[in-house]
Amino acid sequence: MFEINPVNNRIQDLTERSDVLRGYLDYDAKKERLEEVNAELEQPDVWNEPERAQALGKERSSLEAVVDTLDQMKQGLEDVSGLLELAVEADDEETFNEAVAELDALEEKLAQLEFRRMFSGEYDSADCYLDIQAGSGGTEAQDWASMLERMYLRWAESRGFKTEIIEESEGEVAGIKSVTIKISGDYAYGWLRTETGVHRLVRKSPFDSGGRRHTSFSSAFVYPEVDDDIDIEINPADLRIDVYRASGAGGQHVNRTESAVRITHIPTGIVTQCQNDRSQHKNKDQAMKQMKAKLYELEMQKKNAEKQAMEDNKSDIGWGSQIRSYVLDDSRIKDLRTGVETRNTQAVLDGSLDQFIEASLKAGL
């Protein structure tokens, strides 16, 4: 005979948690807005404004993630209750086990939705840019920057995010000097914002014929993409715009025209650049978008006094602001802020970062 009371208690618990989320996530307003967005996307002329249509499509995906999940929770809990009744009436353990398995799946789905409460920042739902910069140390540091790039690309892929290399500077022997990656997806900035900081690698260097232990540093800087309708005033007189020929690995030029664009904001010293398109105009637009995002982040720093110290670290990462240590000799990766540690170093370097990211978000970093 199977024990039904614990299962009924779980159903009651999940129902209550689901009801709390409905209020917290403003289910009714989101459902109403989803209907409005769907109606707008069904209009035949919606694609006359492609950017508007894309924004609506993205909003719909975000709304559906909440509305559909909560709808599925409600229906799923009703279905499980029905299965339990059948199992009891027929004294059928197989049906009972099926109900428990469905309940497990529903609880996992609800836990994922509950985690969204970590994303309370104004721009947590935005796409983002990730800048990786090799520290001093030549080839070893540049190889480490390349390993970080691969790690974050793998992580983004595992979450279903879209990635685009905006700008990449190749290392002289191996690896990269720097890279800017655009990461697009639901709550991309919210997920990655706590990854800003210095990452420290300790290993026996493959570039050292003596196989000696080396310590290398690379920094990561995450900032949100700012919508075009955000009011950031940029005085054209404050900008220096340089064009140059795009180059690939080894320094060879990949085209004969000066299509690559570098923009410098003279008052702040902020630099953005783009060379991933053959069109100079498109590269300039992308570089301006990044500049707008970086200047917006700077404004947010000024306005938010409580988080000033943390934001200063984001905009000017010092090599002392380490967030994570990767000691490959000892098979140990440790987050220096949360204390989370793992010995499965290869899995982390292959993109298994959620345990670190979730811990830092829960800690309110």
UniProtKB/Swiss-Prot annotation:
Protein's cellular compartments: Cytoplasm
Keyword Cell membrane attached: no
Record keywords: Cytoplasm, Methylation, Protein biosynthesis
Chief localisation class: cytoplasm
Description of post-translational modifications: Methylated by PrmC. Methylation increases the termination efficiency of RF2.
SUPFAM superfamilies in alphabetical order: Release factor
One GO CC term on file: cytoplasm
SMART domains listed in its UniProt record: PCRF (SM00937)
Pfam families on file: PCRF, RF-1
N5-methylglutamine found at: 252
One GO term (biological process): viral translational frameshifting
Molecular functions (GO terms): translation release factor activity, codon specific
Domain of life: Bacteria
InterPro entries in the cross-refs: PCRF (IPR005139), Pep_chain_release_fac_I (IPR000352), Pep_chain_release_fac_I_sf (IPR045853), PrfB (IPR004374)
HAMAP family: Rel_fac_2 (MF_00094)
Miscellaneous remark of the record: The gene for this protein contains a UGA in-frame termination codon after Leu-25; a naturally occurring frameshift enables complete translation of RF-2. This provides a mechanism for the protein to regulate its own production.
Annotated family: Belongs to the prokaryotic/mitochondrial release factor family.
UniProt xrefs under NCBIfam families: prfB (TIGR00020)
Function, in words: Peptide chain release factor 2 directs the termination of translation in response to the peptide chain termination codons UGA and UAA.
The protein's name: Peptide chain release factor 2
